[in-house]
Amino acid sequence: MPEFDFLLKLSLFRTSLKAQQTVIHDFWEKAQMLLAGSEIHLKPVPKSWLSLRHNYFSVLFIALFHVLEIPAPRLRLYARLNHCLRAWVTACDNLLDKELKEIILTDLPAKAHTFKSVHTILLTDRIFFSFLMDALDQKIINTAEVEQLLNISLSAISISGREEAEEEGGVMDTPRPDQILQKVHLAKTGHLFAAPLSAPSALGDIDPNQATAKLARNGLTTFGLGCQILDDISDLGQDINDRKYNYLISLIHHRGTHGEKKRLQQLYEDGNLSDHDGLEKLYQVFPEASQQALADGTRQLKKALRSFSECGLPLSSLNRDIFIKILVTVFRHPERFYHLRDR
């Protein structure tokens, strides 16, 4: 698995990782207090969960908060709330995709995949509110701002949730690749990646019309689109099973070779692919379309990195080249991207 530790040579990313580590400890401490006296017991934070590898996206968001010059007390609050957002999204994805990527570790039975995710949502709701009450007590926010943050915590992820709901139970159409990217994936993932900016924008710590803020938002949105294309490559088999929108499926359907189109049709007709069919590597059956999807995903990520650099992240041309080289290594084995998706 490629590492992103080269970023730790940059002081901004070291500072941002330390901030995220503090957030995780704060989150764990709140969980411990809330679970005290219950029948569910919290386990210690795994050391690996404090690494850059496990918190790559969260660290990126915090680094952007610094670049956008958000005052330290508010930045700390937004980083805490963003971790709650991460927990909600991860748990909801688990329920929608019938999988388990844990963000809270308890002594609940290993087989309890569904309830673990339900419990994460319930517990995170209370942690989120406790973080708000702490900020209110410390006069970091006022009562009206508590109300704003409660509202924005739902509305910021509702666009993505609406798209997930539209696809639940399966879809029968196959939009063109450009429609998948600019409509479906923009709603599902593009806006979701930009959601961490919603709270500071709502409270006036970021001016959405200011040039740097626009670059940050556009960069996050584009980064989300690139990540979703990678997600679609590794999720090809599952999305065929569930009849969900998928960029690679769209490429095959609208632009694929005759052979690739025929293979895709056969997979739909066969139905119910299992894990034994190598779902994470099914893209290899469609080499030409997969190569195009990788190129399109790379293009989106390169565009995002340029935006991040222009808005002030210390990503020089050399750093961006290193970044892309690492990402390309991931792209050559898209099934590995599965392990980065909840970061």
Spans of features found by a protein language model:
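Small-residue hotspots
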Residues: 84, 88, 121, 217-219, ...
